[in-house]
Amino acid sequence: MVARYVPEAGDIVWLDFDPQAGREQSQRRPALVLTDQTYNRASGLIVVCPLTSKRTPYPFALSVVVDRVEGAVLVDHLKSLDWRAGNAAFHCKSESELLNKARTYVGVLLGIG
């Protein structure tokens, strides 16, 4: 039996963000996983920040390069999603510095940092 992939913190995964509303990110896109694999496996959920290929100066957008494409991690678009229903697929592992910075920004955003 082949083990099923369970996302872990620091993974960049492809994930379906639809349905969406208003200014939320939509469609299938990459996202940075913030939650640990133990939580993800037990809950069936992951907390992620979507990535965009647009690079606009914004306080909660962290610059990132994935597959030679410059973009940004949208920290203030933090979202909890069912990773199975969203068809999460591993793309690559981010650098630990990016994960740590994203988590720090989330803390600032929520006033817990």
Task: Label each PLM-derived region with a short phrase.
Residues 1-113:
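Conserved functional hotspots at enzyme active or ligand-binding sites that engage polyanionic ligands
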